């Protein structure tokens, strides 16, 4: 089951949990309130529930990515890119089939929430939400990336408030100017 919490302000290793003291857990309904969707699945690539979700949501393309120094070309550069705060014009859909890592997302007050991803976790980040990704201290994740149609993974680093996806996200969240 996914765990999420508000992050501390430490500049220590990005792969550390970064929990506040005392911890401030974030519940699934709080994630849903900022547009983040979550499912707990088996962790198998051929999960039947995943097949149903893919059909219902139109996820017609998928691939697998292994993020580890031994398997990912240009590892150091990729890790820096993933951890740069950004948004996408489409949903970001990830299903963890091995290992673990963290997605950090901004809440409505612009505070960081850290979402721990482990085997079996399926997460959907809405288009226009500022976020970033990092491995945890185990330095390994294997994830299925899902897309509607042809894969597009174009990050727009913050600030990207001029993008229509960001404006629509803010409007949906009741935060439009």
UniProtKB/Swiss-Prot annotation:
Catalyses which reaction(s): 1,2-dihydroxy-5-(methylsulfanyl)pent-1-en-3-one + O2 = 4-methylsulfanyl-2-oxobutanoate + formate + 2 H(+); 1,2-dihydroxy-5-(methylsulfanyl)pent-1-en-3-one + O2 = 3-(methylsulfanyl)propanoate + CO + formate + 2 H(+)
The keyword Iron-sulfur is annotated on this UniProt entry: no
Region called Disordered, residue ranges: 1-23
Cofactors demanded by this protein: Fe(2+); Ni(2+)
Cofactor, free-text remark: Binds either 1 Fe or Ni cation per monomer. Iron-binding promotes an acireductone dioxygenase reaction producing 2-keto-4-methylthiobutyrate, while nickel-binding promotes an acireductone dioxygenase reaction producing 3-(methylsulfanyl)propanoate.
Family that this chain belongs to: Belongs to the acireductone dioxygenase (ARD) family.
Protein name: Acireductone dioxygenase
């Amino acid at each position: 089951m996914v765990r999420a919490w508000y992050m501390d302000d430490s500049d220590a290793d990005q792969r550390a949990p970064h929990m506040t003291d005392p911890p401030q857990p974030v519940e699934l309904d709080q994630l849903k309130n900022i547009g983040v969707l979550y499912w707990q699945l088996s962790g198998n690539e051929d999960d039947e529930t995943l097949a149903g979700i893919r059909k219902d949501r139109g996820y017609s393309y998928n691939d697998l990515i292994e993020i580890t120094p031994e398997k990912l070309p240009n590892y150091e550069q990729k890790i820096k890119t993933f951890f740069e705060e950004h948004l996408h014009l489409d949903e970001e859909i990830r299903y963890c089939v091995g290992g673990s890592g963290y997605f950090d997302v901004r809440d409505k007050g612009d505070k960081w929430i850290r979402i721990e991803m482990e085997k079996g976790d399926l997460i959907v980040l809405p288009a226009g939400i500022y976020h970033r990704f990092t491995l945890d201290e185990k330095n390994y994740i294997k994830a299925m990336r899902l897309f509607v149609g042809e894969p597009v993974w174009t990050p727009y680093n913050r600030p990207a408030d001029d993008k229509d996806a960001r404006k629509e996200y803010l409007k949906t969240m009741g935060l439009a100017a």
